């Protein structure tokens, strides 16, 4: 009896994933759009992903360019400095962020799905992508944080081991740089 319950408990997440209805289409420009609807909570999560904008696109000898640029995207817009941008997001209870990985960069928001709140959050995200601020003071602060973070990582054996293993696995490839 217990092994059967354990097997069912382990398989349950797989059956839930398999039951997820993913709607797919492309807009006029060819952008692929995926939509998963769940109406249990009045929340919307939206993510815009840019394939090829990750760390594999970093210029030679300039690691962290993609990561740094992605982090700066949601630090304000041409109209709103970082503080005002964050205040606008906080006022509507939205979480707006950007990130990158090896293959892509992304920007996203989470907010209530109520139309006026959703539209304000989408507008903030849109402006951060189409009219980013790239404020000099924020850039310098992020630069110091990034350098400090990299220096701290260099002191951990697991980071050093992973970096060296990646170089061995992916010689002459951006993954290994």
What would you call each of these model-derived segments?
Residues 1-8:
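Sec-dependent signal peptide recognition
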Residues 8-18:
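Hydrophobic h-region of N-terminal signal peptides that target proteins for export
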Residues 18-43:
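N- or domain-start disorder-to-order transition segments that initiate the globular core
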Residues 36, 41-68, 82-128, 147, ...:
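M16 family metallopeptidases and their MPP-like homologs
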Residues 77-78:
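Extracytoplasmic
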Residues 82, 86-87, 133-151:
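Acidic/histidine-enriched alpha-helical segments
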Residues 154, 158:
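Short conserved segment of the HATPase_c
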């Amino acid at each position: 009896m217990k092994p059967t319950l354990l097997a069912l408990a382990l398989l349950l997440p797989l059956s839930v994933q398999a039951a997820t209805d993913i709607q797919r289409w492309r807009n006029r420009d060819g952008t692929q759009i995926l939509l998963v609807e769940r109406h249990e909570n009045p929340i919307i999560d939206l993510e815009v992903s840019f394939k090829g904008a990750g760390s594999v696109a970093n210029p030679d000898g300039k690691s962290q360019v993609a990561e740094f640029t992605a982090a700066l995207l949601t630090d304000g817009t041409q109209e709103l400095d970082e503080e005002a941008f964050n205040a606008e997001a906080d006022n509507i209870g939205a979480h707006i962020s950007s990130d990158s990985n090896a293959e892509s960069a992304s920007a996203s928001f989470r907010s209530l799905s109520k139309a006026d709140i959703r539209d304000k959050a989408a507008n903030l995200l849109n402006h951060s992508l189409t009219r980013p601020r790239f404020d000099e003071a924020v850039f310098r602060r992020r630069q110091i944080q990034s350098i400090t973070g990299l220096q701290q990582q260099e002191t951990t054996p697991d980071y050093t081991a992973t970096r060296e293993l990646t170089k061995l696995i992916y010689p002459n490839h951006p993954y290994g740089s």
